């Protein structure tokens, strides 16, 4: 399909991108119409897609897209979330019409509804998931292009691009490659210089991962603001007057001293220790615990045995 032109040949960096994204890895099942695009089969049952044929069909699809005079007449569809971001980026780069998400049945056949469209070319991400637009395109004679895996049905598909249409990196890379070739054939960008748009912008990103990355970035920014100041000790002020006596200027309240008459001890003074001293070892041991308690030696306010 490259026509023997060296400028249209697949470059080494393109092959490395295909291998890194896993575009050559097919499924474990094989459709009889996809046998011509399979190179070999691995020991674990996974089919390997021939990347040379992938590149040739990619160029053929790009030539079909460029042949449409009005870019808005090209309709790109992806019902699976792994290709929705890619088709939106492709539509913004090439000016085509996109349907990201659920395809409303009757868009190509029911002229009554407001969303009725008459495109001249249809591009889908997965023939199995996007079977409804493919079927409607066959009713109104719209040529179709599809990214097909080894187990994809090729019914109503005019140009099948063999690739891995399950992985998010492979799907994003294929749409990026297709957009780049379309812009090159239109003359928008040069083949001598690399395209400034990175393939990462076409990759699907999980919303949970995006939320985690934003949260981590916010925490990092907060921590950076906290430690942004300089760690310097406060400079002492030597111009303050020197204080010699710290008690000056402090008002101490005068407390009157209470006098007690002679013979009366001040409250709070403890009694002599010998008054309360008692020899506990001098008392005999009590054998009969049921007997009435004996009077104690100390004066505790009267020794009585009647506790009632």
Swiss-Prot record:
Entry keyword Membrane: yes
UniProt modified residues of type N-acetylserine: 2
GO MF: laminin binding; laminin receptor activity; structural constituent of ribosome
Family affiliation: Belongs to the universal ribosomal protein uS2 family.
Region (Disordered): 262-308
Chain spans, region Laminin-binding: 161-180, 205-229, 242-308
Site (Cleavage): 115-116, 133-134
GO biological process: cytoplasmic translation; ribosomal small subunit assembly; rRNA processing; spleen development
Summary of the function given for this chain in its UniProt record: Required for the assembly and/or stability of the 40S ribosomal subunit. Required for the processing of the 20S rRNA-precursor to mature 18S rRNA in a late step of the maturation of 40S ribosomal subunits. Also functions as a cell surface receptor for laminin. Plays a role in cell adhesion to the basement membrane and in the consequent activation of signaling transduction pathways. May play a role in cell fate determination and tissue morphogenesis.
Quaternary assembly: Monomer (37LRP) and homodimer (67LR). Component of the small ribosomal subunit. Mature ribosomes consist of a small (40S) and a large (60S) subunit. The 40S subunit contains about 33 different proteins and 1 molecule of RNA (18S). The 60S subunit contains about 49 different proteins and 3 molecules of RNA (28S, 5.8S and 5S). Interacts with rps21. Interacts with several laminins including at least lamb1. Interacts with mdk.
Additional notes on this entry: This protein appears to have acquired a second function as a laminin receptor specifically in the vertebrate lineage.
Organism of this sequence: Danio rerio (Zebrafish)
Classification via Pfam families: 40S_SA_C, Ribosomal_S2
PTM entry text: Acylated. Acylation may be a prerequisite for conversion of the monomeric 37 kDa laminin receptor precursor (37LRP) to the mature dimeric 67 kDa laminin receptor (67LR), and may provide a mechanism for membrane association. Cleaved by stromelysin-3 (ST3) at the cell surface. Cleavage by stromelysin-3 may be a mechanism to alter cell-extracellular matrix interactions.
Official protein name in the record: Small ribosomal subunit protein uS2
Record's GO cellular component terms: cytosolic small ribosomal subunit; nucleus; plasma membrane
Subcellular location(s) of the protein: Cell membrane; Cytoplasm; Nucleus
Ranges of the [DE]-W-[ST] repeats in the UniProt entry: 230-232, 245-247, 279-281, 288-290, 306-308
Keywords carried by this UniProt record: Acetylation, Cell membrane, Cytoplasm, Membrane, Nucleus, Receptor, Repeat, Ribonucleoprotein, Ribosomal protein
């Amino acid at each position: 399909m490259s026509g023997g032109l060296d400028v249209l040949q697949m470059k080494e960096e393109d092959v490395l991108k295909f291998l890194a994204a896993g575009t050559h890895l097919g499924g474990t099942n094989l459709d009889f119409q996809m046998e011509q695009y399979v190179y070999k089969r691995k020991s674990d049952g996974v089919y390997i897609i021939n990347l040379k044929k992938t590149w040739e069909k990619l160029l053929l699809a790009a030539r079909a897209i460029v042949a449409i005079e009005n870019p808005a007449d090209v309709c790109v569809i992806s019902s699976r979330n792994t290709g929705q971001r890619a088709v939106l980026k492709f539509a913004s780069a090439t000016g085509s019409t996109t349907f990201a998400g659920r395809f409303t049945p009757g868009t190509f056949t029911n002229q009554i509804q407001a969303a009725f469209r008459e495109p001249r070319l249809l591009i889908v991400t997965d023939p199995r998931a996007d079977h409804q637009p493919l079927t409607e395109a066959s009713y109104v004679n719209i040529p179709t292009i599809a990214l097909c895996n080894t187990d994809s049905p090729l019914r109503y598909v005019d140009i099948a691009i063999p690739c891995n249409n399950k992985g998010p990196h492979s799907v994003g890379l294929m749409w990026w490659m297709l957009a780049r070739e379309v812009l090159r054939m239109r003359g928008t960008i040069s083949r001598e210089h690399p395209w400034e748009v990175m393939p990462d912008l076409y990759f699907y990103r999980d919303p949970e991962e995006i939320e985690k990355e934003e949260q981590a970035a916010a925490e990092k920014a907060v921590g950076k603001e906290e430690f942004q100041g300089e760690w310097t000790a406060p400079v002492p002020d030597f111009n303050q007057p020197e204080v010699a006596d710290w008690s000056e200027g402090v008002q101490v309240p005068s407390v009157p001293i209470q006098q007690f008459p002679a013979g009366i001890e001040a409250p709070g003074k403890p009694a002599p220790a010998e008054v309360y001293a008692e020899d506990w070892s001098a008392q005999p041991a009590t054998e009969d615990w049921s007997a009435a308690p004996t009077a104690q030696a100390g004066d505790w306010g009267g020794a009585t045995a009647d506790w009632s």
